[in-house]
Amino acid sequence: MLNDFYKQFKSGTDIRGVASEGVEGQSVNLTDDVVADMADGFVLWLSKKVSKKPSELKISVGRDSRISGPHIMKITTERFKRCGAEVLCCQLASTPSMFMTTVDLGCDGALQITASHHPFNRNGLKFFTREGGLEGSDIEEILLYAQNGEHPEESNGGNITDVDYMSDYAKGLCEKIKKEVNAEDYEHPLKGFRIVVGAGNGAGGFYADKVLSVLGADTTGSRYLEPDGMFPNHVPNPEAKEAMDSICEAVRESGADLGVIFDTDVDRGGAVDSKGNEINRNRLVAVAAAIALEGNDGGMIVTDSITSSGLKQFIENDLGGKHYRYRRGYKNVIDKALELNAQGINCPLAIETSGHAAMRENYFLDDGAYLCTKIIIKAAQMRKEGKELDELTASLKEPLESTEIRYKILEKDFRACGEKIIADLTKYAEEQDGWCVADDNREGIRVSFDRDNGDGWFLLRLSVHDPIMPLNVESDSEGGVKTICDKLGEFLKTTTGLDL
């Protein structure tokens, strides 16, 4: 069982911690020794997983732009070499590209050094095999090896080779765009397009230089392509308002046809249309669903729990697909899509409103660059027909009002507290006039309200990892969100354990 020290590093299916000084009250816990022990733990886990000796393993290592990345890369690559493994050092790379090294380069495992959109002082380890990302139980096993001080046998046969895999990965995206757009100028299918990229000083700058420009697009007006692990301009997160405001502004100022935005390690993406309108959250899911359902008539789209009622109508009524509203957590939606496909259900897409999108045609890998590539292909195809990308989701009904409130749970056993509140609220909701508890909800409690009681819905759930209860509310009527919040507030006042 993990002790408290090692338990702090587990973040869902990743390892995360503090790797650099610079934030008051946050001491470095991803020390050199701890990172080395975690690297050894991965070797032991991977050796068992693929039934190979540590000295027979082939492991790739990449990193995003954060300041501690080069140092952690040096520690981990040396540890892998020490046990005799063949190590491919990919330097600055996207997280999805590291998975692809298991496909294209025959790696048994891959390590990406990243902490996604978190602040500059944090970093982490994200692992892959040819089956995809690891499960939470796998991370616990790796941390347990580290905690117990278990190390693979040393061997002199290891080596470290620098590999520019990102160039090969980018070429793969280029070839996909060429083939699917099939332009008259085959080598330059994006000629005449102006597409701006918002990389947020993360690892996504390659998309402007090695993909779009190569294919003939004008990327003038792109922002923050240079990797800078201090993230001086804005949080590299497509969900953050300042990040989306920046790329929307870039599109408007440059007169671009399209804008694309990535998080730090490029496993998430978003877009902006030519009018400067955001294509993220529900609208991003709608665009991705429309693309994924082409050739997959009646297919099922798996999403997280906070999608709107209008999105469900769009997927099922306008696109002719089926909507499976699941739980928050990108690994949850991906695993559910894999499960449904294994049952013989046609499920081409798993997507979170956060921008994690995984397509069956791409190994169910959540890849922001691949998602944006599919959107760009669709925009180019529609231009041939004299259409604009925004026409794809013109019938999507969006709420008039929406909000999110995050309630802190004050109880030590926050999960038990949150679960009791949800159970009590379910009973309460079933007794209220004008309240309708959703029977297809799979996380927390979702309640719809008729026109006289707020004309919308709320979802109250437990956070995946934190002592938080997020509340999402949408309404199709002016003042509806306040009405719904007031009605829910009457119940919440009777609870204990929430910071209201």
List each model region and its residues.
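N-terminal small/polar loop signature for handling phosphorylated ligands or for N-terminal nucleophile
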Residues: 44, 48, 52, 58-122, ...
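Gly/Ser/Thr-enriched, mixed-charge loops and adjacent short helices
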Residues: 123-254
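Proline/glycine-rich low-complexity loops and linkers
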Residues: 81, 90, 143-175, 274-353, ...
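Short glycine-rich phosphate-binding loop at a beta-alpha junction
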Residues: 54-64, 88, 194-196, 299-305, ...
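Phosphate-binding and adjacent anionic-ligand microenvironments
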Residues: 296-472, 477-500
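An N-terminal, well-structured beta->alpha segment
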Residues: 1-76, 82-83, 159-195
